[in-house]
Amino acid sequence: MIPIGKKYGVDAVFALTKAEDIWRGIEKCLYGNGNAIHFSKYGELPCIRAKQINRGIPISVTDNKLHFKLGRMVFGIQVNDRFQQDEVDAVLSYLAESDILDDRAVNTLIKDGYCIDTYRPCYATLVPKMIRGKYRVYLHLTIEGKAKPKYDKHGNPRHKYGKGMIGADIGTQTVAYTSDTEVGLKNLSERGNSIQTSERKERLLHRAMDRSRRATNPQNYNDDGTVKKGRKTWKYSNHYKKLKTKHSELCRINAINRQLAINEDANYLRSLGDVFITEPKNAGKLMRRAKETTVNSKGKFNRKKRFGKSIKNRCPSGFQAAVEEKFKTTGGTYIEVPNDYRASQYDHTADDYIKKKLSDRMYHLADGTLVQRDWYSSFLLYCYDYRTRNIDRDRCISEFEKCYSKEEALIKSCLLYTSPSPRD
């Protein structure tokens, strides 16, 4: 047997960490909901992680600063803002008296039954990234405990935490919410007006790559344009490689903008209330292709594609996970209603469930009131009854007029914003 250090040139702690990651994926296939194990693609940059802070990438303190060592290289941390400085100070304070803080955490857990934040450094990870055509390596330090609160330059808290209930209907592209103070309907993962332009550029580059790949490898395609089955050899031109570099850079920028937009929306919702009520995540089901073959009124076959592109561009599950983490870590409450709640079908004026078409975005209630479908679902989630875990019809009747007036103003502002301006 050849030692792993001689064969691959890595230490045992790195091999053990990577083996645990692989076994976690195998466990999902054996005992969970996983179907197949996916290998890393050629050219992907691997993350280098050591599961022990004193081995592989050990941490040390010199001149009251954190330093890390990998082989013969010694490097520190570049602190850019006050939040990072607070995190570094918390780690330094733990390393100065680690035994005392560990004993205090254990005693608190035994006596009071909860964990305190020790800010113990757990492990370090080297994350390589390709940014603007150059390789950059970042160090991610995983710390035990909750993140430090953020403050602005004047010393005030950067984020405010509100009180009250929030009902939110998270769709594939939009989120509608109803709170004690306001109602809203906005697109997911959107910062400004640049996301639609970026998505269009991404599509154009992807099509240009496909044309170049087809022109360079005509032997791998059938006469009807489909890819041949079996083992194939692909050749890529220099033009294709340049397009791929542009496409990768654009995808990286779009992913960062999506994550920033998700964090901004989660922080804003947390400022409206401390109880968040929504439906369970179902993006994975909506992303799958339809199994049944159907025909439309013109006799043509309907496409089996569903919401895969919308989910990829808008990340509804990522937004819901970020909101859940935000509310739970800041002292709030996150509630997912049961599957039989059916907020999209209930009509509180008729006290009955009425099924609607997916294309009916605006519809009339039983008493003739015109409502927006997504907002009305969020309103029914807002009227959640803790005892029965169902819709509280009495609260729907008492709160509807106040919330409906806000919804009318919201729809008018949306129509005014989207209407074209007259030409001179």
Where are these regions (language model features)?
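Acidic carboxylate diad motif detector
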Residues: M1-I131, K309, N313
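Residues forming well-ordered secondary-structure scaffolds
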Residues: T17, D21, R132-K134, Y161-G162, ...
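Positively charged, helix-rich recognition surfaces that bind polyanionic ligands
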Residues: V137-S419
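A short, hydrophobic C-terminal helix/tail in secreted or cell-surface proteins
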Residues: P420-D424
